[in-house]
Amino acid sequence: MPTAPGPEHATDSTTDTAAAVLARGLHLARGARDVVGGLELRIAQGQVVGLFGSNGAGKTTLLQALAGLLPVRQGELRVFGGAAAQARRAIGYVAQGVPDGAWSRLRACDFVASAWQGERWGIGLSPGGRARRAAAVREALQAAAAGHLAQRGMDTLSGGERQRVCIAQALVNPVRMLLLDEPLANLDPRAQLGVLELVRALRDRQGLTVLLSAHDINPLLGLMDSVVYLAGGRGRQGRVDEVIEPGVLSALYGLPMQVARHDGYLFIHPARGFMAEEGGPCHHGGADAPDAHGPGNGHGHDHAHAPAHAPSKDLP
């Protein structure tokens, strides 16, 4: 199973002109609480990057900062060469969770149309504007392999279908980068695979840069060009084999970590001796500390482990 970037998507460190994202000494906060500090990132255009870490480690915070929705507390964050807020129109952002309330009662085509930027400029009020909006919605749904869902109500769609429509909404305006917050959450293995195949197609056919956060690293191993792992207010970017290894993870978490490999899957857990000395994972404290277990437990945290029902290890 490939874990390193292929040559066509390899990171080019010799120049920053090809960087979709560049961060130097980046500090992000939620109110008075520092979330991420001193983060260094360089993501080339056209790459797929996985974002992982414990609950509260800052994954959503980082995605929102990249989307221009959250200010930088300290350091530098550049998106396509400028400030993230200036690049907002070039970014499609899909937040975690599913549409609820009034949004859930819309048809899929109307849900996608609600994000068309022409509405902001008054274009949607004219017959020509309505035609352009309809064309943009149709193209976005087709790009997300969701054209057949256009007339369906959002509340009638499966989890995988809803995720495709949400991605279509992010594509209804011309974008160069997609930010997906937990797009695989609560999806069965077949639906997960469908979303990841869509991400691959958007990268390969449209050259989009894609950052997506996930609880489980394993479904993404054949797709990612690099990984960003956040823990303990710090972060590290690199190839999977550079970041998902005991030395790096121990430094991030501030406690001894191990990485086990079995049948092509990765399991991350505190070192066995540490658990015995400290009385188990309930005693080594903090929101950033992962518990140690295998697949099949009902839980909602962000470190990497094999899924209870493992999806295909290699995407087509």
Tell where the protein language model's regions lie, with residue ranges:
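Conserved ABC ATPase signature
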Residues: G153-L157, E161
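ABC ATPase nucleotide-binding domains
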Residues: P246, L252-P316
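The feature captures the beta-strand-to-loop junction immediately N-terminal to the Walker
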Residues: F52-S54
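Conserved ABC ATPase "signature" region
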Residues: G128-L149
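Helix-to-loop junction immediately C-terminal to a conserved catalytic motif
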Residues: A67
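Conserved ABC transporter NBD signature motif
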Residues: G75-R89
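Catalytic Walker B motif of ABC-type/P-loop ATPase nucleotide-binding domains
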Residues: L178-E182
